[in-house]
């Protein structure tokens, strides 16, 4: 068994998502396990160099994970042929230019979503990557959540029958910054800085819908800025110029209807921060991030509408938990392992830049729907 080194430029990992999910729980965890196992018995050991503007902060982060390589010189890192993969988790506005530089330098690229703030920029990167012949991927982490994987198993088994509708509820109350500090960065609420829940979350909903229930064919969306003013990290008040809630209905191939409420201005009274209620002809299921409950046709209660008496049926009963039939690793780590195998062994990899561009396409269609107050068709996206 041979151990093969894979040099990875990790850009933008000083932020919460980059540091926690991509560095600590993915790359560092993979290294601690001895690398990624390939089909031939070899292992691939990722050797990251942390790249960013603040070398002191990068050095502290590297030390915490037993790493030594850091740099603030991106150009020099891109020129180093010993590191063949470029990863970006910095701001969306910077991403297209960074990916373009990395592809031009011959690097394979992997990045957070959204790929870009607009479809034109996203497709330009897709075309550049295709012309260069490099391997490329986009984070689509929700597909790897235990709840989503168990839900997909239910659907594929035929338990739900013909799918009818999906109702998604996502979000929580993000504090304005006065009563309590906000738990999300202030740029999320400034449109000029790439903020907005439509840009953030509809990229997720596109791949969740496409891969779980059916391809999105049209969208009707209403956005809102419910909280007009917030307080930033320095204690200064600022005007919220980005949408903090989105109410979107999707038509899917096969006739399935999906509706998602996404909000950073809602208080949670449901099973999880994200729940998907799926109805089919033979059964229904409600999935959270980790757990899924289901109800089959013969166990469905038969209520009768009578507002004059207290409801006698407890509708939370009669649902069965879907058991954990396997152990579920971190979703970001699983996708990193799949991408590393794709780069080093040529294994198939579905979640590429074109799939990421589809998310940006849906965002643009949703924003157009909101602006024009009408349904917008979502055409097939081709290179």
Predicted regions, residues:
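C-terminal glycine/acidic-rich active-site capping loop/insertion
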Residues: 228-234, 238-239, 247, 251-252, ...
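Predominantly a Rossmann-like dinucleotide-binding segment in NAD(P)-dependent oxidoreductases
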Residues: 142-240, 373
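C-terminal capping/lid region of NAD(P)-dependent oxidoreductase domains
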Residues: 3, 134, 161-165, 368-383
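N-terminal Rossmann-like dinucleotide-binding module
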Residues: 2-65
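Beta-strand-loop-alpha-helix segment that lines the small-molecule cofactor/substrate pocket
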Residues: 83-85, 91, 96-143, 158
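Short, well-ordered coil/turn residues at beta-beta hairpins
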Residues: 88-89, 252, 261, 280
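Short acidic low-complexity segments
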Residues: 40, 69-81
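Glycine-rich phosphate/pyrophosphate-binding beta-alpha loops
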Residues: 203, 262-270
């Amino acid at each position: 068994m041979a151990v093969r080194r894979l040099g990875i430029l990790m850009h933008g990992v000083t932020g919460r998502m980059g540091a926690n999910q991509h560095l600590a729980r993915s790359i560092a965890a993979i290294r601690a396990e001895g690398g990624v196992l390939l089909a031939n018995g070899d292992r691939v050991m990722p050797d990251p160099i942390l790249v960013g503007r603040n070398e002191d902060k990068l050095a502290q982060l590297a030390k915490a994970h037993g790493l030594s390589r850091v740099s603030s010189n991106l150009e020099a890192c891109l020129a180093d042929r010993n590191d063949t993969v470029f990863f970006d988790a910095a701001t969306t506005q910077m991403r297209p230019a960074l990916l373009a530089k990395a592809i031009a330098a011959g690097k394979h690229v992997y990045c957070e979503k959204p790929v870009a703030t607009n479809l034109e920029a996203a497709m330009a990167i897709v075309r550049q990557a295709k012309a260069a012949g490099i391997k490329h991927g986009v984070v689509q982490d929700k597909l790897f959540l235990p709840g989503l994987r168990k839900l997909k198993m239910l659907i594929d088994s035929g338990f739900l029958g013909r799918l009818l509708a999906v109702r998604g509820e996502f979000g929580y109350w993000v504090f304005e910054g006065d009563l309590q500090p906000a738990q999300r960065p202030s740029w999320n609420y400034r449109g000029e800085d790439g903020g907005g829940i439509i840009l953030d979350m509809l990229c997720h909903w596109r791949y969740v819908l496409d891969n779980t229930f059916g391809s999105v064919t049209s969208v009707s969306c209403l956005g809102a800025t419910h909280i007009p003013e917030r307080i930033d990290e320095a204690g200064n008040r600022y005007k919220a110029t980005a949408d903090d809630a989105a109410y979107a209905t999707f038509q899917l191939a096969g006739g399935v209807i999906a509706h998602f409420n996404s909000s950073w201005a809602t208080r949670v009274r449901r099973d999880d921060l994200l729940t998907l209620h799926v109805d089919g002809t033979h059964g229904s299921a409600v999935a959270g991030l980790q757990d899924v409950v289901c109800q089959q046709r013969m166990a469905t209660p038969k209520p009768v509408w009578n507002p004059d008496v207290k409801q006698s049926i407890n509708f939370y009963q009669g649902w069965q938990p879907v058991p954990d039939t396997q152990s579920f690793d971190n979703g970001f780590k699983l996708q990193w392992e799949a991408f590393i195998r794709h780069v080093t062994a040529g294994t198939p990899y579905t979640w590429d830049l074109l799939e990421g561009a589809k998310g940006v396409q849906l965002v643009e269609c949703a924003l157009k729907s909101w602006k024009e107050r009408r349904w917008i068709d979502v055409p097939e996206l081709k290179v």
